[in-house]
Amino acid sequence: MKVAVLGAAGGIGQALALLLKTQLPAGSDLSLYDIAPVTPGVAVDLSHIPTDVTIAGFAGMDPTDALVGADVVLISAGVARKPGMDRSDLFNINAGIIKNLAGKCAEVCPNACIGIITNPVNTTVPIAAEVLKQAGVYDKRKLFGITTLDVIRSETFVSELKGISLADVEVPVIGGHSGVTILPLLSQVKGVEFTAEEIATLTPRIQNAGTEVVEAKAGGGSATLSMGQAAARFGLSLVRALQGEEGIVECTYVDGGSEHATFFAQPVLLGKNGVEEVLAYGELSEFETNARDAMLEELKANITLGEEFVAG
């Protein structure tokens, strides 16, 4: 099993690479790519960690060598948020980066599962889909927007609020991956009751948690370490499913035949070909139903923006 990380010299990429080096199954290959010249050095640094994961690093304008034979490609390349920016402000730079890298994946590893971390995910995933379609290699079972950070934040905040073990907390998060399109289904958390006031406070905190980190870092970065952990959780789940482990479910942003939008985040059963089945997200509370319906216009506009970017 070969996993490639594109954007591996950045804050997310290095954290993700560290976690993959220590947690991928023995015998895995880990390939790091970034335009930054430091990337081969990041691989050398990680190679000193004693795990049975082979690692190589590649720098420069062409990711081909990193992508050859890849089963999973995780893309975190792009610019990060700074104070005052929202994820959509990243679009102009990151859209072009994703278009180019998706094109390389189509050319070099057309059968790989691709997980997109680069924001704005609501838009970068449709960009990748359109590029793969143009190349004639699009398989909607194998393209994912990694929204796991919204899930781990939800689980952490619920655990803190209610004083319960994280081992007992599961929070499905549906919709998209920015602002109001992030919808944690707090009504579905087992064994916990929330007041209307708690839901009205906790939901926007989860939606705006990225801004919380950007402001706390005072211009020094965005959510890199927690995003690295979230991407590793998703990537490792995907690897386990590809290797035949059954019953692995993660919330992720996919082209899954949703009645709401072409791309929609919801629980997905992972399997040997990527998406095994898009699962129903269950009954919503009145608050959640209203929030879902209110977000759809923005989510659809984000998707259209990506499709039109590729169409030119």
From Swiss-Prot:
Database matches in PANTHER family: MALATE AND LACTATE DEHYDROGENASE, MALATE DEHYDROGENASE, MITOCHONDRIAL
Family stated for the protein in its record: Belongs to the LDH/MDH superfamily. MDH type 1 family.
Keywords: NAD, Oxidoreductase, Tricarboxylic acid cycle
EC numbers for this chain: 1.1.1.37
InterPro entries, sorted: L-lactate/malate_DH (IPR001557), Lactate/malate_DH_C (IPR022383), Lactate/malate_DH_N (IPR001236), Lactate_DH/Glyco_Ohase_4_C (IPR015955), Malate_DH_AS (IPR001252), Malate_DH_type1 (IPR010097), Malate_DH_type1_bac (IPR023958), NAD(P)-bd_dom_sf (IPR036291)
Protein name: Malate dehydrogenase
BP term (GO), one: tricarboxylic acid cycle
GO molecular function: L-malate dehydrogenase (NAD+) activity
Annotated GO CC locations: cytoplasm
Subunit structure, interactors included: Homodimer.
Organism, as annotated: Moritella marina
Ligand binding (substrate): 81, 87, 119, 153
Coiled coil start-end: none
CDD domains, per the entry: MDH_glyoxysomal_mitochondrial
Leading EC class: oxidoreductase
